Amino acid sequence: MDPDRQKLIERARELNTSEFPVIELQERIREVCFEYLIEAKVDVDHLLGHEDWRVRSSALDMVWWGVGATDGIAASIEILMHDPDEDIRAEAALALYEAARGTPKETQVREAFRRVSAAAEAPEYLRAAALTYLGKLDHPSGQRRVGPGVGPVSE
């Protein structure tokens, strides 16, 4: 293996065992995604549970790219449903859509999107995002969409 890549993998693995300032965590997470360091086996679930929203946001990129030892789907669903930061919840919706389509986890993600789209306490834009991604999962060709409160409708 290329020594430079090995060094990047070791830096990424430190995300599992060391505490770093938020900026350092974000930089290392970006490296994992940019270099597609799947060999590093980063514990995405641990990063998704971080107290700082910036780390959770960066970790959602790992879910999207599928580069962690843990896939982060369950933790991302938890963020989608309950994170105190509404913007992070919206990011989780996109990451879940990208990570789950065509995988065995798609059923879990569909159910989470259904729950969010029907949750009166969820912000309108989050309900709309959940409906949109649910529609995209249902009709990946883009020929049909899900309309608010009406179910699948033709374009």
Where are these regions (language model features)?
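Amphipathic alpha-helical scaffolding segments comprising HEAT/armadillo-like alpha-solenoid repeats
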Residues: 2-13, 35-49, 68-82, 103-117, ...
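A sequence-level detector of short, solvent-exposed, charge-rich linear segments
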Residues: 63, 78-79, 96, 111, ...
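Secondary-structure boundary/capping motif
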Residues: 9-13, 56-57, 75-76, 89-91, ...
